[in-house]
Amino acid sequence: MTAADIDSKKRKRKHKAKKGEEAEPVKAHTNGAAAVEKPRKKSKKEHTPEPEVEDVVADASENDVESGAEEDEEQVNAELKEIAAKAKKAKKAKAAQDEDEDEDAAGSGANALAVADLPSGTSIPTVDDPTRFDELNLSERTMEAIKTMGFESMTEIQRKAIPPLLSGKDVLGAAKTGSGKTLAFLIPAIEMLSSMRFKPRNGTGVIVVSPTRELALQIFGVARELMEKHSQTFGIVIGGANRRAEAEKLAKGVNLLIATPGRLLDHLHNTQGFVFKNLKSLIIDEADRILEVGFEDEMRSIIKILPTDRQTMLFSATQTTKVEDLARISLKAGPLYINVDYRKEHSTVEGLEQGYVICDSDTRFRLLFSFLKKHQKKKVIVFFSSCNSVKFYAELLNYIDLPVLELHGKLKQQARTNRFFEFCNAQSGTLICTDVAARGLDIPEVDWVIQFDPPDDPRDYIHRVGRTARGSEGKGRSLMFLLPSEIGFLKLLKEARVPLVEFELPANKILNIQSQLEALITKNYYLNKSAKDGYRSYLQAYASHSLRSVFDVHKLDLVKVAKSFGFSTPPRIDISLGASLSRDKKVEGRREYGRQPQQGRRPMKPNKRF
């Protein structure tokens, strides 16, 4: 029975009452829920508390009419109690709904989000063409993190990408390495998670796919700084890490997930507690590199598994046919294309001084040793073409008391992580590595990049030298070693808009240590074995080079090449140079991101100086 029915009965009782007897007026009830005064209107943010059941009964009893009929009064009180009980039930339902909305980000199920699209409260920049982060109308928590990180003005890719990403558009971005695109895609993703109030029970709302473990770790570090004040969760899954621990974290709920393709696909297929049906944003970073190392099939499978109702951001330093195919299947129709480099005169950054030196194979190591000796107080990265070459030269240089760090795909994941961050935090030192460190990694204040072995093509050259002179005002230098037979590579670099000058190094500045090197390799069993592995891998990598017209293995002087590994004569090795090498090289590259064979470090004798 409603309050209106109660009023009708009261009027009947008044009519039957004795003449001249006045009844107390009853307050009007307009909502048909309880006999209380209608509360004043409040703003959306102000919460209007529901009246307690005792208050409802008390207010109704005070406004009840006097009646001579006791049974009528008891009936009215019973009806009022029934109404109060309904009000209490409605209050509990409302409270439960509010609590569910708060915990589920407006969700109605255990881990389902009812909001399919970005909320209407998504940040909109306060100016038409923002140049500073404080003009983007970001949340206070994100802005506080950005200020703590020391950023005020945006780079070009950030200015062009963040506003449309905040509004929910799909973006295909092309930008040089070191352009600041990590913040360009993380800030909109974190703002989306915050505005939708994602909770761990909602599962994963954002996935960032990275080509290498080191780049994934770096993105994870940036995300950790940006999300320090946010309540959303974040995590990382990469090859070589503890899969069971990753699965447990995914089951607890990771709102922002950074991953390498192989491990991500593994969890999508096999981790039952991994909730990704609420995915709102997919970010593919360094897409060209992901495809180059052979993850095309994995990426296609990942895209098929993930929900289609999402925002997608795809960033690639170069636009290839495979990248276009990946964009076609992952992005919605009509994505926004952003290219911040098409008007630039050079393909590399302005603060980078680039040079090359022509030298024979038997001079290369002596030149490198002399250079590193002279620049021990600088921060230097040296690139090699194979894991075994890195292992040999790292063991050799450390043995002769020239400390270096090594980074390559055959290291266990924990060792890779430790050495990467050790070099990042160092003020000076030398890192020798394969191309596993060539893409996307933001290593602070690198002074020199040395390309001991030639890159696979001009694009790889650009990515290698991109480890130095990072940022809008970064400065750095690069030096590439070329054999006389490899000069044709300079023409390709010129066509790719790479400015290079020749560096001339006087012969008297190159230390003459060849005889000591050969004597050491002859006497030390472990170094001798490592040198053979490095020599064989160098020839295999050279034979599988994509630019065989320039890098022709048959033009190599094997005697001089052997001397660069400490042999007086070329060692007898089991090697096959053929068409299969290119395929083997790709398989080896894939293995860097998958399960690793057990590696043990060879025991060394005490250090010996030349």
Curated annotation (Swiss-Prot):
Region (Disordered): 1-81, 112-131, 584-610
Keywords tagged on the record: ATP-binding, Helicase, Hydrolase, Nucleotide-binding, Nucleus, Ribosome biogenesis, RNA-binding, rRNA processing
Record-level GO BP terms: maturation of LSU-rRNA from tricistronic rRNA transcript (SSU-rRNA, 5.8S rRNA, LSU-rRNA)
Domain annotation Helicase C-terminal: ranges: 351-521
Taxonomic superkingdom: Eukaryota
Binding site for ATP: 175-182
Basic residues bias: start-end ranges: 9-18
Residue numbers covered by motif Q motif: 131-159
GO cellular component, as recorded: nucleolus
Chain span(s) of sequence motif DEAD box: 285-288
Enzyme class: hydrolase
Reaction it catalyzes: ATP + H2O = ADP + phosphate + H(+)
UniProt feature, compositional bias: Basic and acidic residues: 584-594
Residue ranges of every copy of the Helicase ATP-binding domain listed in the record: 162-337
E.C. numbers: 3.6.4.13
Keyword Nucleotide-binding: yes
Record flagged with keyword Hydrolase: yes
Chief localization: nucleus
Intracellular or extracellular location(s): Nucleus, Nucleolus
GO function term, MF aspect, one: ATP hydrolysis activity
Described function: ATP-dependent RNA helicase involved in 40S ribosomal subunit biogenesis. Required for the processing and cleavage of 35S pre-rRNA at sites A0, A1, and A2, leading to mature 18S rRNA.
Complex and partners: Associates in the nucleolus with the 60S and pre-60S ribosomal subunits.
Record text about domains: The Q motif is unique to and characteristic of the DEAD box family of RNA helicases and controls ATP binding and hydrolysis.
Family: Belongs to the DEAD box helicase family. DDX18/HAS1 subfamily.
Name of the protein this chain belongs to: ATP-dependent RNA helicase HAS1
Gene of this entry: HAS1
